[in-house]
Design a protein with these regions (language model features):
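Hydrophobic alpha-helical transmembrane segments
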Residues: 60-76, 135-146
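Membrane-interface alpha-helices at helix entry/exit sites of multi-pass transporters
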Residues: 55-57, 84-85, 154-161
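Interfacial segments of alpha-helical transmembrane regions
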Residues: 15-19, 72-96, 160
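Small-polar-interrupted transmembrane alpha-helices in polytopic inner-membrane proteins
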Residues: 87-106, 158-174
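Alpha-helical transmembrane segments
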Residues: 16-30, 89-93, 163-168, 221-226
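Membrane-embedded catalytic cores of phosphoryl/pyrophosphoryl-handling enzymes
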Residues: 120-266
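Loop-to-helix transition at the N-terminal end of transmembrane alpha-helices
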Residues: 46-61, 87-90, 184-189, 243-248
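N-terminal transmembrane-helix/juxtamembrane module of multi-pass inner/ER membrane proteins
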Residues: 1-67, 99-128, 263-270
């Protein structure tokens, strides 16, 4: 991509705006912890659940990193359009989230409040680091990429707001299933803005799209879709509806892999 002065100024503005959002999320999240609003908020949510457990189980699936990767890759018109940005965000996000969890291992809600005080849905993790929420990061980063690309294509503004609202709901599902504190989700949202902005700037300077649109890139994408399909074949929910939906996503990933194989074979004959 171009590295003109216009892009440099734009990049600085993006990073400055994202810095403000990240600081707000960090201050808000830390304040919830310091003033013990985290526990009060968590208990109120689980004391009187508004929506059924199967609903949160289904929504929670959309925050899975592999599901998010599938959604983004399938949303491309053709391989190599925004694949580079997607993969950079996915890889950088995984690294940032796991690093923060390792450096600041905050206990999960069930370890502090007790499992009997929460409505735990689909056996959420109990012992790994709680902050930040990887699902919240994945959902928001997915929405940011989709909204950015769709806005450039001139998609109606109302659809963009719907994507943003759904991403917020997916993020909040981590609190509803008992896996994360509200502060974890808020910090995950802030981190998503930061990583997506950094990878966007990275993409404007050095893109992998040319290689990813080649025959070798197609092989990599076929491998990725195959891994996604294998991952999704393992049920992650106790609810049959969610299991069926998860299986349909696995089939979608296999279909995309087959399509890419056909494209790769066509490239070899040209």
């Amino acid at each position: 991509m171009s590295t003109s002065a216009t892009h440099v100024v734009s990049s600085k503005r993006i990073l400055l705006s994202v810095g403000v959002i990240l600081c707000f999320c960090l201050v808000f999240g830390v304040s919830l912890i310091i003033f013990e609003f985290n526990q009060q908020w968590m208990l109120r949510i689980h004391l009187d659940p508004i929506l059924p457990n199967w609903f949160w189980s289904l929504i929670n699936l959309f925050g899975d990193a592999w599901v998010v990767l599938l959604i983004l890759l399938v949303s491309e018109r053709r391989p190599g359009v925004m694949t580079s940005w997607i993969l950079k965000t996915w890889l950088a996000g995984a690294a940032f989230v796991q690093l923060i969890k390792y450096l600041s291992p905050m206990p999960r809600p069930a370890n502090v409040l007790g499992k009997e005080m929460l409505t735990l849905i689909d056996h959420p993790p109990l012992f790994s680091g709680s902050m930040p929420s990887g699902h919240a990061f994945a959902a928001i980063s997915c929405a940011l990429i989709l909204v950015t690309v769709m806005k450039q294509r001139g998609v109606n503004q109302s659809y963009l707001w719907m994507i943003a609202a759904f991403a917020g709901l997916v993020s909040w599902a981590r609190v509803a299933v008992g896996a994360h504190w509200p502060s974890d989700v808020i910090v995950g949202v802030g981190l998503a803005f930061l990583v997506v902005a950094l990878t966007y700037v990275w993409e404007t300077r050095s893109s992998w799209n040319h290689w990813l649109s080649s025959k070798h890139g197609a092989v990599l994408l076929v491998l990725i879709h195959s891994l996604i399909a294998v991952y999704l074949l393992v049920p992650q929910s106790d609810f049959l509806l969610v299991q069926i939906f998860q299986l349909s996503l696995a089939c979608l990933s296999v279909s995309k892999a087959i399509y890419l194989i056909k494209v790769s074979l066509w490239l070899r004959t040209t």
